[in-house]
């Protein structure tokens, strides 16, 4: 089981409650938002929407009150739509010492094998990278069974190539409604759940995307903020142990 770790050994000292998005904040303020208490490992996820990144400035956030250690980057969407900032930013993330990961935005009506193969062609993962991520946010008017089958097809094909179970990203409500089948419990789970003090999902989870309006020095636009549900050592254990060579 992943454990929620404390910052150092002490509980998070909460700031006085203040209004955040018309709701009281009971945590501490950081990056312009209400930050969850008691997580030591923070991260962001980015795509071309974030614009040009000042990587030198971004590294200073590793020394911040809420240190940013990992970055997920959008690589692909559907069967043929790549993110045009991915290659450069993925290289820069490693060069500047971040733990990096790559994600695919799933289009349910596009053939899942085609989507998996497109991701595989685009993303070369190295030792120390996080497992590949599948981002599922819509049903694309597919039936629940069609959606489950398509998602499982992508996960299986990508796992066969990289030799590691992919991370599954969904919102709290989407997971409960469409992907609650126990077959998906085998995959590390990255949950999107905004404007709540804590994760209400009862199952095991690894990452929590807690806001989409973070303000991070080095990034011009607002950015998604995440926490890892564990220690730095546990995050490193999740990373790839060997480079992914063509199989």
Q: How should these model regions be labeled?
A:
Residues 1-8, 12-15:
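Single conserved hydrophobic/aromatic residue that forms the stacking wall/gate
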Residues 3-4, 36, 63, 199:
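Structural motif
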Residues 7-8, 96, 185, 203:
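Short, structured coil segments at secondary-structure junctions
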Residues 14-24:
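Hydrophobic single-pass membrane-insertion segments
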Residues 26-50, 56, 180, 184-247:
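Functionally critical loop-and-helix segments that line ligand-binding/catalytic clefts
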Residues 80, 109, 175, 198, ...:
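Flexible, glycine-rich phosphate/dinucleotide-binding loops
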Residues 130-202:
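Catalytic domains of cell-wall/extracellular-matrix polysaccharide-remodeling enzymes
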């Amino acid at each position: 089981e992943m454990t929620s770790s404390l910052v150092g050994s002490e509980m998070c000292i909460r700031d006085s409650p203040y209004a955040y998005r018309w709701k009281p904040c009971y945590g501490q303020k950081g990056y312009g938002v209400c930050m969850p208490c008691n997580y030591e490992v923070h991260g962001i996820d980015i795509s071309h929407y974030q614009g040009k990144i000042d990587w030198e400035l971004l590294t200073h956030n590793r020394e911040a009150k809420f240190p940013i250690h990992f970055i997920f980057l959008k690589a692909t969407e559907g069967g043929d739509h790549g993110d045009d900032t991915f290659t450069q930013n993925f290289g820069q993330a490693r060069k500047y010492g971040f733990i990096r990961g790559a994600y695919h935005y799933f289009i349910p009506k596009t053939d899942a094998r085609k989507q998996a193969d497109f991701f595989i062609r685009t993303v070369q993962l190295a030792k120390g990278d996080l497992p590949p991520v599948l981002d599922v946010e819509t049903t694309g008017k597919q039936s629940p069974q069609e959606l489950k089958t398509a998602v499982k097809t992508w996960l299986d094909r990508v796992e066969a190539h990289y030799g590691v179970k992919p991370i599954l990203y969904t919102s709290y409500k989407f997971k409960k409604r469409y992907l609650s089948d126990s077959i998906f419990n085998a995959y590390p789970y990255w949950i999107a759940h905004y404007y709540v003090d804590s994760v209400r999902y009862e199952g095991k989870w690894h990452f929590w995307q807690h806001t989409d309006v973070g303000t991070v020095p080095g990034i011009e636009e607002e950015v998604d903020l995440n926490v890892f549900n564990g220690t730095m050592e546990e995050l490193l254990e999740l990373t790839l142990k060997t480079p992914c060579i063509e199989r």
